Regions:
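ABC-family P-loop ATPase nucleotide-binding domains
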Residues: 36-93
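Conserved H-loop
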Residues: 134-143
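Catalytic Walker B motif of ABC-type/P-loop ATPase nucleotide-binding domains
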Residues: 105-109, 114
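ABC ATPase "signature
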Residues: 165-166
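Helix-to-loop junction immediately C-terminal to a conserved catalytic motif
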Residues: 6
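Conserved ABC transporter NBD signature motif
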Residues: 14-27
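Helix N-cap at the start of a conserved alpha-helix in ABC-type nucleotide-binding domains
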Residues: 116-118
């Protein structure tokens, strides 16, 4: 869905619009920024040069803020993008997303490869950014528990179908996390909509 919104994939059917404009139009694409798992910059480009490039394509890109984030995350600006670890590759893309200042910022699995400290820092910066520069931020993640307190509205999608679409507070009030012996848990869950299961041992 996020790739369709940002024009990277074409829908099989139907239409997608951003503020009334077709999603693949310049008017729509200029309002959107996708922080995905893939790096879209040349691999041998240095982080510093990538920030310069972002500023060209996104007029409201805050270069000084991006550099301050790089300092907080300890991301070296003179390092080539292909020399970054998985975690620091994610951090590089997160910094772009937090600094771009478009009306809509889409984060697809944003904390991939990040350790707990860097995940916490990202979530803190996400809230801070929203407070200072309100915009629509979409976070697509499997780590629901980590973002539940940050998200106002939740859409749960499985295999292309919307299972739930409601305010987060309303959804969490109607959900349970159940643990115990497998047989007892399976018995309790029978007939209920199970979102995910984890087996230990």
């Amino acid at each position: 869905l996020l790739n369709i919104l940002t024009g990277r994939l074409c829908p099989d059917s139907g239409t997608v619009a951003v503020d009334g404009a077709p999603a693949d139009s310049d008017a729509a694409l200029g309002k959107l920024f996708l922080v995905g798992e893939k790096n879209l910059y040349p691999d041998d480009m240095k982080v510093k040069r990538a920030l310069d490039t972002a500023a060209v394509f996104y007029p409201d890109f805050d270069r000084s803020y991006a550099e301050s984030l790089a300092k907080q995350f300890e991301l070296p600006l003179n390092k080539k993008i292909n020399g970054l670890s998985t975690g620091y590759g994610s951090i590089f893309r997160l910094i772009l997303g937090l600094s771009v200042n478009t009306p809509y910022v889409l984060f697809d699995e944003p904390v991939l490869g990040l350790d707990a400290q860097h995940r916490d820092l990202f979530y803190k910066l996400l809230v801070q950014k929203y407070a200072e520069h309100p915009c629509t931020m979409v976070v697509s993640t499997h780590l629901i528990a980590e973002v539940a307190d940050l998200i106002e509205h939740t859409v749960i999608i499985r295999k292309g179908r919307i299972l739930q679409d409601a305010p987060t507070e309303e959804l969490t009030a109607a959900c349970w996390a159940v643990s115990g012996p497998a047989g007892l848990v399976d018995g309790w869950a029978a007939g209920r909509n199970v979102l995910t299961t984890t087996a230990l041992g």
